[in-house]
Amino acid sequence: MKPVFTHCAFHVRDLERSVAFYREFCGLKIVEEHGEGPNDHAVWMTEDGREGEYVFVLLLGGLGHQQRDADLSHFGFAVGSKSEVDEVAHRGQAAGMLAWPPKAFPFPVGYRCALRDPDGYLVEFSYGQPLGPGAET
């Protein structure tokens, strides 16, 4: 069998804040939670309908994420329209989390913005990339 990408696991300082961020801004829901101690508590989150395909695994015990401005490493989420990118950016700015304001780029980047999650990870929201909603435009 060919390997299949199933999850991305990363440490977070405050599990409750991180779960709230990914629920509010990315629409993810908890599908699994296990562990009890401060170093073994994990929460699995995914999108509706993708429970058996791909999950984010949030692991308690992170130190925070330091990322240089020139480092474009990020988690990417597609949204259904440019106005949805603008709406995420507006809510992110109000919460003090906006890292990249909305901007249009040539294909394949599309229209995008990014927020910093509670640990400092960049989370991109895009429309018009060749993946997800807007891929056909």
Model-derived regions, located:
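N-terminal beta-strand motif that seeds the catalytic metal site of vicinal oxygen chelate
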Residues: M1-E16, H74-F75, Q129-T137
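Short, charged/polar, Gly/Pro-enriched secondary-structure boundary elements
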Residues: R50-F56, D119-L122
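Vicinal oxygen chelate
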Residues: F5-R13, V43, G64-T137
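Alpha-helical elements of the RecA-like P-loop NTPase motor core of helicases
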Residues: V19-A20, D86, V123-E124
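Core segments of cupin and vicinal oxygen chelate
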Residues: K2, A9-Y54
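Short, solvent-exposed loop/turn elements at beta->coil junctions and helix N-caps
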Residues: E33-G35, G62-L63, K103-P106
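Acetyl-CoA-dependent GNAT
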Residues: L59-G64, G128-P130
